[in-house]
Amino acid sequence: ILDSIATSGEEILYCGDDSAGELGDILHYCFQKWHELSSDELLPEGKKSELFELFLTHFAEGCLKEFDWWWDWIQMAIQLADDEEKQGRIIQELDKVINIKGDEWGINYNRQVAQRHKLEIMSKRGTPEEQFKFMYENVSNPDFRRRLLQMAWDRGDYKEVLRLAVDGA
């Protein structure tokens, strides 16, 4: 039922009258239930894998891409990605978003969100040095710049703090 509602969600929102917010509330409720399911540690392995595939497929196919719910798909897949193979598949999907060319607001927003999720996956499987390098390579991401500023401040590298701050201004 949850899947049927969510996969029809875009059509429902585009074609229906959601001026009272009720259609969006239904989708929000579905995602709330999915988040609960994906965080359930007692969920059988078979169900976890099934949900992982469902979530990653919906993300890859762009289900609800015009809405922030699209990012819920990948968040839940990340929560269920308990091995390197699954984590690698998520990174592949995130890289597709990161590598989209363009300077439009939506492209930049999606790129930054995808970079944050990729860093989250890297924290599960990569080294701190790899994460640090990734943040520096993507220092235009405001979240990464803030983290790098804080890290430089914490280690007393005020020259680097100044450089990062000036470059970001």
Language-model features and meaning:
Residues 1-169:
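Eukaryote-biased, non-catalytic alpha-solenoid scaffold regions
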